[in-house]
Amino acid sequence: MNIFQTSLKCCVGLVLSVGVLLGDSKAFKVRVDKSLTPPFLNVLSLAFKQDMKKEIVFVITKSNKLSKKVLCDFDAFLLPEALMGDMPEKALFHKEFLFQSKENKTLYAFSLIDSQYCSKGGNYRNELEKLERWFVQKAPELAESYRVNYKNQYNKTQTPQK
């Protein structure tokens, strides 16, 4: 093998390694409703980071009338059932009901974006399925413990309140 081929293989290997590393560090974007409080979203975010070693970003949007381009910027949705019902059916994949708010009895549902709807494939589907499994397993228990321990809320910038 000559020097050019060796250099080319090293360069391609480096690009692939960096691409995999950067791809793994991408945070999941989850659209949420303003009714979910920032302290509860912090609880979800910190638990997700601890369990999955990956970041999650919660994005609050004002309008439910979102274009396909805007919807495809999200990896998943955590919304009240009523708002989830207004979303295009083709955009959602595996809608799951997770928990109910104590105050106004709002039922919250979680759904992944359908990767075929957004023309995303490959490893993206596997990553989304990991996100879904975590939410289905952990979010209901975190919501319940958050309700029970509401006087002991944690915020990233505060110490526990009593």
Predicted regions and their residues:
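Composition-driven detection of intrinsically disordered, low-complexity segments
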Residues: 14, 86, 158-161
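Classical Sec-dependent N-terminal signal peptides that target proteins to the secretory pathway
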Residues: 1-24
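Low-complexity intrinsically disordered segments
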Residues: 3, 58, 154-156
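N-terminal segment of the mature folded domain
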Residues: 26-118, 122-124
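Ligand-binding clefts/hinges and TM-proximal coupling segments of bilobed small-molecule sensing domains
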Residues: 116-161
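Short loop/turn hinge sites at secondary-structure boundaries
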Residues: 23, 71-72, 149-150
